[in-house]
């Protein structure tokens, strides 16, 4: 049991096999040592056993808040999803924003632990400190968007006001190894195959109704001082400043042009470090231009709204709307997730600079519940394998930048409907092993790299290699210093000092993931503000 501020001391352990729900507190020593969020969630997963089958009923799926979740602390709407990954075979934790983390805290919970496997599809309904399993047979097979609509219609609540849902799509239901969990239509626990684990448990969704259990600081004065200082630094930052900073104006995709200019944008399955270097080396048509899919271009042409997560003044989410023709059919697509990582993987790395096609594919990936980074990178891997004749025996191949085929393949990957879709759904490690395609796989521990070329950013290369959840930019975000100059500018191409830099960011992000607050706080505030808010709350 713990009486630390910021905690409800209330965790639900849900046995999906039997349908039983037990409630337990949090050990005081664990709360102090592991903090919450990622720290506590990974401990639950580790204690559950390291030899479990990731897709077996014995694997644990943990949704965990941190002590700052749902408070006034800036950008404190995050939630950690922790499990053993079917993609990498090791521990993973994946975080998403939006409002579900805060609402879970307000409903009286610090976390939800799912074990076992339901005989039939179910969803978990969470309200006022209790969890109830309900039939989800009518939701099974639906995409995420239709699932969200059905959930909202079936409950006395409204998204954006007092209701949140975290759901899987066909990707999770069918065991795509990089399937993800989608929160409120477009915020993703994207990496590591959390959606695959959720699908293996026949758990379609977790629905959370807001309550009134708002966290109260143990030391209001200390917390308020830390919070106010943090907000001031966020407002003054060139990166996070509301309506002025690059992240606020253009979202994460502000990095597209910056990475391109410094030759740090993996292009053509990482063969090149920018679209202009690809064009210079191979002047034959078609060449592509990263600027066409940049945050600046998106803002100027297809931006329609800028919603935000709980307690966030930055509003990095960029909602877009496009009218796009696919196979003679015109579609209108509106979505909130035109992120840099997604745009890189489905764009330059796949030799695609069709801005609107990327918006369509991001929205479709979210609906199917598959990670945009791994999906785009698997498409790029398939394109290079096609070029090298490694897929000649299949009835389907994929050419560079073939957006029509890319869009169709998303469905085939999630549903595993074609030979190529079934192959790519296995993830890079298994494809490389089955097809002798290790040279085509840009992955560490079976998870593909993000949108920062390690040849141009040595710190990021160390980060990919040492991340415990596979290739990951978020474990230790060295581009903060290597691109943005925060806390100070370093030469991205030099090795000296990069191990120390990477370790610094890995430690910092372990803390923010456990609080659980957004890493973008670190673009403005520092450890002093973190400590003041944590000490004041607990």
What does each of the following model-derived ranges do?
Residues 2-191, 195, 200-240, 251-271, ...:
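Protein-protein interaction/assembly regions in multi-subunit complexes
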């Amino acid at each position: 049991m713990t009486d630390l501020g910021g905690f409800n001391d209330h965790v639900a352990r849900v046995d999906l096999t039997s349908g039983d729900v037990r409630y337990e507190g949090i050990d005081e020593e664990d709360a102090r040592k592991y903090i919450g969020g990622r720290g506590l969630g990974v401990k639950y997963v580790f204690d559950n056993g390291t030899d479990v089958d990731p897709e077996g009923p014995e694997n644990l799926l943990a949704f965990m808040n941190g002590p700052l979740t749902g408070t006034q602390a800036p950008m404190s709407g995050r939630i950690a999803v922790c499990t053993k990954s079917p993609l990498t075979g090791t521990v993973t934790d994946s975080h998403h924003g939006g409002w579900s983390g805060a609402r879970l805290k307000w409903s009286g919970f610090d976390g939800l632990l799912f074990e076992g496997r339901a005989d039939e599809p179910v969803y978990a309904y969470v309200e006022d400190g209790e969890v109830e399993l309900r039939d989800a047979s009518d939701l099974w097979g639906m995409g995420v968007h239709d699932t969200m609509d059905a959930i909202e219609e079936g409950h006395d609540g409204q998204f954006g006001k007092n209701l949140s849902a975290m759901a899987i799509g066909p990707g999770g239901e069918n065991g795509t190894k990089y399937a993800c969990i989608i929160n409120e239509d477009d915020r993703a626990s994207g990496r590591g195959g959390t959606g695959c684990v959720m699908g293996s448990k026949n758990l379609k969704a977790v629905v959370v109704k807001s309550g009134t259990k708002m966290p109260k600081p143990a030391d209001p004065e200390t917390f308020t001082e830390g919070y106010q200082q943090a907000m001031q630094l966020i407002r003054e930052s060139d990166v996070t400043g509301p309506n002025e900073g690059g992240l606020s104006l253009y979202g994460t995709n502000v990095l597209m042009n910056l990475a391109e200019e410094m030759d740090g944008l993996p292009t053509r399955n990482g063969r090149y470090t920018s679209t202009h270097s690809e064009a210079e080396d191979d002047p034959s048509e078609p060449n592509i231009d990263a600027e066409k899919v940049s945050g600046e271009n998106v803002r100027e042409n297809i931006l329609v709204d800028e919603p935000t997560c709980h307690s966030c003044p930055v509003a990095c989410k960029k909602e877009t709307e496009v009218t796009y023709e696919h196979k003679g059919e015109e579609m209108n697509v509106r979505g909130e997730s035109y992120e840099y990582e997604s745009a890189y993987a489905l764009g330059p790395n796949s030799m695609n600079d069709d801005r609107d096609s990327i918006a369509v594919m991001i929205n479709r990936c979210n609906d199917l519940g598959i990670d945009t980074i791994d999906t785009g990178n698997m498409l790029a891997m398939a394109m290079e394998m096609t070029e090298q004749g490694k897929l000649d025996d299949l009835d389907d191949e994929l050419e560079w930048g073939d957006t029509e085929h890319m869009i169709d393949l998303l469905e085939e990957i999630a549903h595993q409907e074609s030979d190529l879709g079934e192959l790519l759904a296995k993830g890079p490690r298994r494809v490389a092993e089955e097809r002798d395609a290790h040279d085509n796989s840009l992955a560490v521990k079976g998870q593909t790299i993000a949108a920062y070329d390690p040849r141009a950013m040595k710190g990021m290369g160390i980060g990919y290699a040492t991340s415990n959840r596979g290739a990951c930019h978020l474990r230790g975000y060295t581009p903060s210093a290597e691109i943005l100059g925060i806390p100070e500018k370093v030469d991205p191409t030099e090795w000296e000092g990069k191990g120390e830099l990477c370790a610094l960011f890995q430690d910092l992000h372990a803390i923010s993931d456990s609080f659980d607050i957004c890493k973008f706080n670190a673009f403005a505030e520092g450890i002093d503000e973190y400590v003041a808010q944590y000490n004041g709350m607990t």
